[in-house]
């Protein structure tokens, strides 16, 4: 065994030291490294961390040792004169540290294979604790008791936790100055454990996310002194998503940043200030890039429109077939708010719009379970809107409104004979108070029930052939006679129109939609011909048609009343023949008489802006790429200015048509000078003592460390590089892992100069800085 250990040490020994000159970056500092120190531990050690565990002013090393089901703690003994390990008669086992080593190795047992480890103070006592998560799905905290003592494990079982070193993060995420814990889950949410004022950890709560991120990080992206939550999906064309921390310690919506797919990343204040930079390695090219987060005015779009910041708000995941989601003013302040049903928990989440156009954090109120539809209107014109909720689970329609204390009381069910299947609310005649319209089912017989705020109710039986369940009920004057009608959308069926007659009753007609029936029907309304009247917008795959319901030509000699048909007034095409338009919204652009039209193209993941040209023909003006398309509808909404809002089952989003935007601005890139080299990972740290940080790339094709300077001009300047080992000389090196696989930059020699600590094969290498 001793011979094998010596052989391994010999083949890894590099004669002499290394010197790195940063003169090319106009920096005069020189730094170099003496020959490396080698500390064998075990195969497959991982999760390298550096921290002063025992408070002696010296940095210690921590690694996960899953082969032995333990976490190894390497206590730093540099300069200590009271050591007890300098002489021993004990025979050294393989990978034992010899007497006189810089580190004394200790360990803590684990009851699981640890996937992620963070070393940080999570109880406010100033001592770094151990936070880890593994295959037993237990988030575990071992508190540092000082004097090399550790608490018993405190665990939280989290079945959906992701088994990945990048899935765990620690930092102050709610602005109270205390470190919190975040664990990325595979179920659409982050498990968040806030540190409380008594320094205990609260029970986990979920922070929803969109997409399928593989990593999280807590860091200050925008330099405002507050930590933000970063999501990374390496293989996505928008790998980086950020939720900025806003007032009150809340997290804002997600902002997506577009780059190429990446294999690794590093976020750091490379210039020594508060500005965070992103260093990433592009998957396709292996080229390293450095970018900066910048705030810029939105680019012009068309007319008064500018392309603002698309913001995505993930909702609590729901597996219900449908859930109620609506943009509407619910507190009477004239601003559109967001109301979201939580079908499984029987709650209503309300996001009130603030004066600056942002949404406050959600307030939850109890309501009916299984709410699938929501409607809002000031039913009695008292200035306080009512919220109407339809629950098929409870076979009820109920109403509630905010009280003077800002509370939403439990909804009051409305008297109803039968099962409600669709509802809408709005004025049926010009100037009238809103009427609640409900389609109900009583033992297979469908009826229309209308109810006003004073309790007046009417019921009208509908056709016996009406058996299918509608997805949408809309109040809209489809024949432009000044009386509001009811439009019922049913998958794979004709459009059912309840035409209002002068006596207030409704004529039930079924009309073929232009282009045929649809699997997922939808509609919108807009004046697209400029005559001051609103047309119905109906989709036909790659275009929408503006239609008006008109009587069909009467057949000569026929005695029946003429049938009804949709007459096409105009057509607006998407950007391509294979476009799939699933939503449309109109927004007034400056002083234009006819509003602009936005089409949601799900096939191309685009929002298409269309406008009428001088000849009155609709043209595509601009296609805006969307990082997320899991939405089912769009509409115009005012959020401190004009915006297009998106709604979906588990997320909503909005695109302001103005304002400033965050962008990821690329500063420079770097191709390794190592022939056929493969940059796999990167870390950063200050190796000169000047405040600016250098980059250390782990090159795993030829097993090099590749050092690069980040210059004051924002450029990546090549420095020194050396081979950590030669693959063919290393015994048992075929472990399938990239080498060198982890690296840290910290002072472990006690001379106030940062050293290089590298994890390779079964050992830790330390390159002391000269």
Model-predicted segments: where are they?
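Beta-propeller-forming repeat regions
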Residues: 20-770
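Bacterial N-terminal signal peptides
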Residues: 8-19
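Positively charged n-region of N-terminal signal peptides that target proteins for export
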Residues: 1-6
